[in-house]
Amino acid sequence: MREHFNDGVEFARFLAHRFVTDKAPNSAAALTYTTLFAVVPMMTVMFSMLSLIPAFHGMGESIQTFIFRNFVPSAGEAVETYLKSFTTQARHLTWVGVVFLAVTAFTMLVTIEKAFNEIWRVRQPRRGVGRFLLYWAILSLGPLLLGAGFAVTTYITSLSLLHGPDALPGAETLLGLMPLAFSVAAFTLLYSAVPNARVPVRHALMGGVFTAVLFEAAKTLFGLYVSLFPGYQLIYGAFATVPIFLLWIYLSWMIVLFGAVLVCNLSSSRLWRRRSLPKLIVLLGVLRVFHQRQQLGQSLRLTHLHRAGWLLPEDEWEELLDFLEKEQFVCRAGGGEWVLCRDLGAYSLHRLLNRCPWPMPSRERMPASLDEAWYPPFQQAMERLQVEQEALFGESLAHWLADGTSGAKVT
């Protein structure tokens, strides 16, 4: 039990480190800024899509009220009034204004995809038709699915009102869980569809549940803070709603991006526990696997590397690929696979050590043994090198910098 608890704590630390490394707070700030400009266009597009289906006529306002009631703290009530007014005015825009709103909505989706691709270490973002179709699906199918879900909720409510609370057993509980269910569905769809990477549905669902629960908890705590510490009203007066709403948007995006970090790393949860090896040794191991598969006329992907015993997380794999591609060791073969495109017989280890951005490991960091045929002679060579370095540079700095030491003096 204690071991599982320690593993959980270590995994949480790992996620927090990845969250900061992936610049998620900066991405959340950028998304907050974009949301300010995109929230009205998104709502306008939603109302436009719902108006195309006669059964959903007049449902847009009800959905907007539902969203603010269940997904925004009580401080957002004043903002809801302003947004309703802005959205109503936006429906009377000319076609030039409509195009501008559509571009603004697409900009928000581009920012979301960029943040997710940063977390998933995606090297090749979507382009052209693929990106347009994804965004169009989100802007068109999203409101329709939301409208369908809201129609089901309305039906359950009316059934209970007309035929009594016993008409549908558990209807009250079901209605109470609807906001959470909508959140889970939305986050699951977001995590599975937006990154330009393969995301297992099971992991996306787990991340959706985690994010939805965290979102509900944050909404409750944020509402308590606003009600118990109203000092911001003394500072901002009539404008107090604006900074509070901005803070809530930023906090919401922080939660969404942390959920994305969780989903991304669920597939590599067994890899973070491994004892980290010096990057130089990992690089040599990866080159050995590349060389071996080159002899067989085969390409390499991360799963092949795992089967060979090198359990690299995806971010470390991408980091190594960046160096190997820059040094023209490997070339992309398509489908996420890579091939060795350089003759290793014409490239010395000395040259690799000079070009490698990672330092040579100290004796303490070198593993005692490694199931690789090349490692024992490499380990001996590194030990000899360090002995020679200590013999040459073992004297104190005072000895080297004292007056009268050998060596030319720069004038």
Swiss-Prot record:
Protein's membrane topology: Multi-pass membrane protein
Transmembrane segments: 36-56, 92-112, 132-152, 174-194, 207-229, 244-264
InterPro entries named among the record's database cross-references: UPF0761_bac, Virul_fac_BrkB
Localization per Swiss-Prot or TrEMBL: Cell inner membrane
Domain of life: Bacteria
Entry GO CC: plasma membrane
Alphabetic keyword roster: Cell inner membrane, Cell membrane, Membrane, Transmembrane, Transmembrane helix
Family the UniProt entry places it in: Belongs to the UPF0761 family.
Protein name: UPF0761 membrane protein PLES_43641
Organism lineage string: Bacteria, Pseudomonadati, Pseudomonadota, Gammaproteobacteria, Pseudomonadales
